[in-house]
Amino acid sequence: MKRIFPILILVIAIAGQATAAVQTQNKLIVKSKRELDVKYLLYLPKDHAAKPEKKWPLILFLHGAGERGDDLNRVKVHGPPKLVEKGEAMEFIVVSPQCPKGMVWNDEVLITLLDDVAKRYRADVTRLYLTGLSMGGYGTWSLGLTHCDRFAAIAPICGGGDFIKAYNAGDANGKALKTLGVWAFHGAKDPVVPLAESKRMVATLKKFGHPGPKLTVYPEAKHDSWTKTYANPELYKWFLQHQRK
């Protein structure tokens, strides 16, 4: 994805309102030096329209490399979009963008999308949560550390990242980093992204002074450490325990 420059023109194409356990297909068009379409799935809690004064917690979900492309149905195969598609009701706004083929997650594009959706759909900006798997796990570490003041908690799954970003984030906004909820997940037998990647990121945060980054390791799991994680109600309870002051 191309870097977004300071002046942005945002054009939004919205495919209707979501009701009950339904997620809609949407597109954000960002015009800078080139026009970039950001396609995403949007889920709104069933009471969203009935409670126009309420601010809602929001989850930004980043898929893995295998779901890249221009078919949003691919994004529904894992994570919160999968749960919603199966009819599970969630008490969060869920935003699930699709990364174009051949590209990786871009922090500026994601923040632009997050800002637009949060404003348009009455998200509680003190309860923004970030999670992703594999390539999305890397994206979660990157976006979560670069913009640690924006998120209340992050949950990277079978990911890793540039540990220098942890130091840079701390230098820029140490208090925000140290109050960011962090819960990482990984399979001990992952042949694609070694467990050492998550361990290194968690260890780096501890060295920097983060009081409690968590790491859950599934002893027998290989690369798929996300199915069990996203099916666990405790993850969503943990998200809601964190609020950005």
Task: Map each language-model feature to its residues.
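Sec-dependent N-terminal signal peptides
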Residues: 4-14
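Alpha-helical scaffolding within the catalytic cores
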Residues: 72-85, 113, 138-141, 161-175, ...
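C-terminal catalytic histidine-bearing segment of alpha/beta-hydrolase fold enzymes
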Residues: 43, 181-185, 191-245
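A domain-start/cap signature at the N-terminus of enzymes
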Residues: 16-58, 92, 133, 138, ...
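Gly/Ser-rich "nucleophile elbow"/oxyanion-hole loop immediately N-terminal to the catalytic nucleophile
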Residues: 47-54, 102-135, 148-150
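Primarily recognizes the serine-hydrolase "nucleophile elbow" in alpha/beta-hydrolase
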Residues: 119-120, 126-176
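Active-site machinery of serine-nucleophile hydrolases
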Residues: 58, 62-113
